[in-house]
A protein has these predicted regions:
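The feature captures the beta-strand-to-loop junction immediately N-terminal to the Walker
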Residues: 38-40
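Helix-to-loop junction immediately C-terminal to a conserved catalytic motif
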Residues: 53
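ABC ATPase NBD coupling module
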Residues: 70-85, 115, 119-122
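Conserved ABC ATPase signature
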Residues: 145-149, 153
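Conserved catalytic motifs of ABC-family nucleotide-binding domains
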Residues: 166
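Catalytic Walker B motif of ABC-type/P-loop ATPase nucleotide-binding domains
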Residues: 170-173
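H-loop/switch region of ABC-family ATPase nucleotide-binding domains
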Residues: 206-207
Length: 260
């Protein structure tokens, strides 16, 4: 079975940085998994997600997404980009546009070039966007402007836009970091349930262990650009968590559980 994402010996440094953001990272994610990247700020989680989304250049190693190897010097093909959806921490919505228009933006990679340029969605585009709005519980907000919404509503719009893209792999960067615990649980339930219903794989980042344990079948701990552990959620113990959030001292040996 082709992995949703496959990474081997990946290293990357941001231009001008004195230390690498990612160092010798290896990771495989099976189709249909819900996997959490767990770690403190600066661990490398956002960088890894951006790289899998095809937005970074100049890395070393092997990276394949949905069976297609990525080129460290070129953006991925348009068709492959359409298969990978991204939920941004800060939403990345068009504030003065309506909710429906923002969700339809998720269809741009599926539209013909002419429709994309003209902003003219097809009946299918409208149907898919409508289904995403319904699944995210915001069907009644379609004509509202985004700048009139609450933070929780905006995150639902961002997820609906991602779902409208019909991705096979969903990458979510700290999708609930700005929400209170109850809202955070609602949003992650929505995201993981919608992905499961569509047969999509989810890789999300978090710095909150309790959310990672609840919504991921597998947790990958990251610190200082390296993987500290990669374990099924039931096997993650308190010692591994303590090692992950220890600020000083050497990195512990990587604990791995093979993906089958």
């Amino acid at each position: 079975m082709t992995a949703a994402a496959e990474i081997e010996d990946l290293s990357f440094a941001h231009p001008g940085a004195s230390l690498p953001a990612l160092e010798r990272v290896s990771l495989a994610i099976a189709p249909g998994e819900s996997v959490a990247l767990l770690g403190a700020s600066g661990a490398g989680k956002t960088t890894l997600l951006a790289l899998l989304d095809g937005r970074l250049r100049g890395w070393r190693g092997h990276v394949a997404v949905l069976g297609t190897p990525l080129d460290p010097d070129q953006p991925p093909p348009r068709a492959r980009r359409a298969d990978t959806g991204f939920v941004f921490q800060e939403f990345a919505l068009v504030e003065r546009a309506t909710v429906l228009r923002n969700v339809l933006n998720g269809r741009l990679g599926r539209m013909s070039a002419v429709r994309a340029v003209l902003g003219s969605p097809s009946p299918r585009d409208l149907d898919v966007a409508g289904a995403a709005l319904t699944d995210c519980g915001i069907a009644d907000l379609g004509e509202r402007r985004v700048d009139s919404l609450s933070g929780g509503q905006r995150q639902r719009v961002a997820i609906a836009r991602c779902l409208a893209q019909e991705p096979r792999l969903i990458l979510a960067d700290e999708p609930v970091s700005n929400l209170d615990p109850a809202r955070a649980a609602e949003i992650l339930t929505l995201l993981t349930d919608a992905a499961k219903a569509r047969g999509a794989t989810v890789l999300f980042s978090s710095h909150q262990p309790e959310l990672a344990r609840r919504f991921a079948c597998r947790i990958v701990g990251m610190r200082a650009g390296r993987i500290v552990f990669d374990l099924p959620t039931p096997e993650l113990d308190d010692d591994a968590m303590a090692d992950l959030y220890r600020e000083n001292g050497p990195l512990p040996g990587v604990r791995l559980k093979a993906v089958t």
